[in-house]
Amino acid sequence: MTIYFDMDGTIADLYGFDGWLSHLRAESVTPYAEAAPLVNIGELQLYLSILQNRGYKIGVISWLAKGSSKSYDKIVRKTKKNWLRATFPEIHFDEIHIVKYGTRKDYVAKDKFGILFDDDEEVRKNWRGLPINPNMKDIIEKLKEIKELTD
C-alpha cells in the first residue's frame, strides 16, 4: 500500500505565499522554494517512518504550474524535489511524480489503489483508491489511524 501526498495546498502552503500567482506567471520558483509546510514536520516524519517500517510506501504526486514553459517546468521539478528533501530530510520517498498541470494522478501512481491526500476535489473524485481531503481530515490524525490499524 502506498500513501501519496499532493504538495501545493496539501503539505506545502503555496497559496499562502504572498503573490504566489504573479510569481508563477513570471516563471519564478520562489513560492515553491519558500512555501511553508502545512503539516507538523516532526510528526509527519515520525508516522511515515513507522508506516514505512510496516511495509507502506510513500509517494508524492504534484502538478506543475498551469500553462508553463518546458524550461520553467524543469526548474520547478528540481525546486519541488529540493523542497521535499529540505523540509522532510528523514523521509525516503519511494515515488516522486511532478507532472503537467491537470494530469490524472491515478494514471501516474504505481499503486492505483493507494491512499491520496489532495486538496483538489476533482483529483479526489478520479482517484481509484482512498482519497482524503486534507482540509476536512487532519493528515497527522489520519496517519495515526492508519498506524493503529497496523498495531
Which residue ranges define each predicted feature?
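A structural micro-motif
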Residues: 1, 56, 91-94, 114, ...
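Conserved Lys-Pro-Asp/Glu-containing loop-to-beta segment of HAD-superfamily phosphomonoesterases
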Residues: 2, 97-122, 127
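Alpha-helical substrate-recognition element adjacent to the catalytic core
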Residues: 2-87
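A short acidic, amphipathic alpha-helical/loop segment
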Residues: 43-50, 107-109, 126-129
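Acidic carboxylate-rich catalytic motifs and surrounding loops in phosphoryl-/glycosyl-chemistry enzymes
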Residues: 62-67, 94-104
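Lumenal/extracellular "mature" regions of secretory-pathway glycan-modifying transferases
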Residues: 75-78, 91-98, 133-134
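A short acidic, often aromatic-flanked loop/helix-cap motif at beta-alpha or helix-coil junctions
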Residues: 93, 101-107, 136-144
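Acidic, Mg2+-coordinating phosphoryl-transfer loop and its flanking beta/alpha structural elements
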Residues: 114-151
